């Protein structure tokens, strides 16, 4: 048994919404308590997708419960440099649009580093920012996120514990992650003005928030690792009142979640037993059926062994459970109605191309529902290529040239004067949408589906022309609910790949969940696929679908049909490999692990998690 390796208090909630409500309520209580004492409240604020839920809850508390911001003073962590306050990418604009203009805060009480000052004045501006914080009495409550490099604010690897507000160079990984917001890494500023680690550490209370599987590894390093200049978030271990707030996905790599049996007695479940035995198999390099009593004892699993007659009996139970997960085509459903929800027009083939084809081969009524257009992920040069095709063919076949010519000219002129990161015109967005649609239709035909088996939902929340989307609204839910009522599916497949850097997967998941809550029909089984950003662990997966070499090649061929995404996707995240390369490696790796555990050897595998059906809506 080992001691809990967590070096900072951690609170884990199952969902991001629960985290946002908890932190917002803590801030509201602080504002009210200090107001009653005749004091102002000084908040340190962050930007990005992580704190938006907090800001929405604070706005709700202001509107519905009268939370008063007139005595609140705010200091933001950072701002890109150079950056005009009016820019779509400005943190000034972000804060006003997402919080300040919705509450009764005094404009003079808002402080955000300026990205528009002359370079020669930056040092003076940084000193003024530090003085303003001190004159306000210091920060009472600081909100932080954590970057892929472990940065807090823009304190990149190597930042000193005593650093103050200053101009910094942005890490390559940080700029890559931000590429989605700027429509390409080349458009991301190379510098930023940020509060220093020392400035942050002087806050009286700190809340660091992290959500999603993609943050799990860096969260583990920040929470369980030694204090390290290479991971600025580890400095928070020295703060007396810092707390890390995580959703279940971001907490996945913490010892308490990943290997809880190492920390002491636990309530064993069949799933935990499988996880422990798979972990032991990998730790020892032995297949499941070859594990012996000494392996269990030497790796802290004596309590698990004591629950069974022998190591052989336990090994057999786990081996049989793992074997039951493997389901080739003959063991997959037949004659069912199936909806495959695909957040973007390529997620279906990327993450579930193999199972999609097998379900279709099994005489199921399969429909692929593309939830968003994916149009912001199309490069401008792709549009120019299609425009050239239209122009040439209109001359060849003499169709609609008089009506087509003005449109072509309008689009070409717009693209010629378009600034980096500028929102596309309606015409350009429409063309990019159609490009993604024809690619999606071409891709599913490679998997033997017909074009009429596709439905393009074009959910409204996505239609901003920007990476930052609107919240899921009633119309989004109605569209999905209407589809459920029309098809009345037995099974739905949903993206469980919630680490999508720009959040669309998570929002599409929320839209389906809300629709299921209102759906009055027989609840469908919900299958969750992954693949674009990570794969399900073997122990967590409920279905493992074997793919032959030919089937994997066909799946990759389907991915190739998404030509606008193939060579270099506009928003690849930190992983710069093409999607087909990620998928090939992940699907092969899953099969290889199954082989190492002692199960039959397969060329590749897709993994699916099955959740219980949602409870049907109550009838009036």
Identify what each model region corresponds to.
Residues 1-42, 60, 332:
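N-terminal glycine-/serine-/threonine-rich phosphate-binding loop
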Residues 6-7, 11-14, 18-19, 81-89, ...:
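Conserved phosphate- and dinucleotide-binding cores of soluble alpha/beta proteins
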Residues 42, 73, 140-141, 205, ...:
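Structural motif
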Residues 54-60, 152-165, 500-516:
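Short Gly/Thr/Asp-enriched flexible loops that form oxyanion-binding sites at enzyme active sites
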Residues 71-81, 111-116, 455-457:
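A short, structured active-site edge motif that brings together acidic residues
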Residues 72-78, 210, 243-248, 367-371:
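Short internal beta-strands
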Residues 119, 275-345, 349-528, 557-561, ...:
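Active-site beta-strand->loop->alpha-helix modules in alpha/beta enzyme cores, enriched
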Residues 536-592:
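A conserved mid-domain beta-alpha-beta active-site/ligand-binding segment of alpha/beta enzyme cores
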């Amino acid at each position: 048994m080992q001691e809990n390796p967590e070096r900072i208090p951690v609170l884990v909630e199952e969902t991001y919404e629960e985290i946002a409500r908890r932190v917002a309520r803590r801030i509201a209580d602080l504002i009210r308590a200090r107001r009653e004492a005749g004091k102002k409240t000084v908040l340190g604020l962050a930007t990005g997708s992580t704190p938006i839920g907090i800001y929405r809850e604070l706005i709700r508390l202001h509107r519905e419960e009268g939370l008063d911001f007139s005595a609140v003073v705010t200091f933001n962590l950072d701002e890109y440099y150079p950056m005009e306050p009016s820019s779509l990418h400005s943190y000034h604009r972000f804060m006003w649009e997402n919080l300040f203009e919705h509450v009764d805060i005094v404009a003079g009480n808002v402080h955000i580093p300026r990205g528009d000052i002359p370079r020669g004045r930056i040092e003076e501006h940084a000193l003024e920012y530090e003085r303003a914080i001190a004159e306000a009495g210091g920060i009472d409550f600081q909100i932080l996120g954590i970057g892929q490099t472990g940065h807090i604010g823009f304190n990149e690897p190597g930042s000193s514990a005593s650093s103050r507000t200053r101009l910094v160079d942005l890490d390559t990984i940080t700029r890559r992650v931000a590429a989605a917001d700027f429509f390409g890494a080349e458009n991301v500023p190379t510098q930023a003005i940020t509060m220093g680690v020392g400035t942050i550490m002087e806050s009286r209370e700190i809340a660091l928030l992290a959500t999603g599987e993609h943050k799990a590894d860096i969260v583990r390093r920040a929470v369980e690792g030694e204090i390290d200049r290479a991971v600025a978030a580890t400095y928070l271990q020295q703060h007396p009142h810092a707390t890390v707030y995580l959703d279940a996905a971001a907490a996945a790599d913490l010892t308490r979640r990943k290997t809880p049996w190492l920390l002491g007695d636990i309530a064993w479940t069949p799933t935990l037993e499988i996880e422990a035995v798979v972990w032991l198999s990998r730790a020892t390099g032995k297949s499941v059926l070859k594990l012996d009593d000494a392996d269990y004892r030497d790796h802290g699993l004596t309590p698990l062994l004591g629950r069974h007659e022998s190591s052989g009996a336990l090994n057999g139970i786990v081996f049989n459970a793992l074997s039951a997960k493997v389901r080739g085509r003959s063991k997959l459903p037949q004659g069912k109605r199936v909806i495959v929800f695909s957040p973007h027009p390529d997620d279906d083939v990327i993450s579930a191309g193999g199972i999609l084809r097998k379900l279709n081969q099994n005489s199921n009524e399969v429909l692929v529902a593309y939830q968003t257009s994916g149009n912001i992920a199309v490069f401008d040069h792709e549009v120019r290529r299609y425009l050239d095709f239209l122009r040439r063919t209109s001359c060849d076949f003499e169709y609609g040239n008089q009506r087509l010519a003005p449109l072509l000219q309008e689009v070409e002129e717009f693209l010629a004067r378009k600034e980096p990161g500028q929102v596309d015109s309606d015409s350009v967005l429409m063309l990019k949408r159609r490009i993604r649609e024809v690619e999606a239709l071409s891709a599913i035909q490679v998997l033997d589906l017909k074009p009429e088996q596709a439905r393009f939902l074009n959910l409204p929340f996505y239609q901003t022309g920007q990476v930052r989307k609107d919240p899921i609204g009633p119309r989004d839910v109605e569209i999905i609910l209407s589809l459920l009522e029309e098809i009345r599916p037995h099974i739905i497949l949903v993206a469980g790949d919630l680490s999508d850097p720009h959040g669309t997967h998570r929002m599409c998941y929320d839209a389906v969940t809300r629709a299921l809550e209102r759906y009055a029909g027989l609840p469908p089984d919900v299958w969750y696929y992954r693949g674009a950003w990570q794969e399900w662990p073997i122990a967590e997966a409920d279905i493992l679908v074997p793919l032959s070499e030919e089937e994997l090649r066909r799946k990759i061929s389907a991915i190739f049909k998404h030509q606008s995404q193939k060579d270099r996707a506009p928003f690849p995240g930190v992983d710069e490999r093409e999607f087909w390369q990620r998928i090939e490696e992940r699907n092969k790796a899953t099969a290889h692990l199954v082989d190492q555990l002692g199960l039959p050897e397969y060329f590749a595998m897709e993994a699916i998690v099955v959740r219980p059906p949602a409870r049907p809506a109550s009838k009036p």
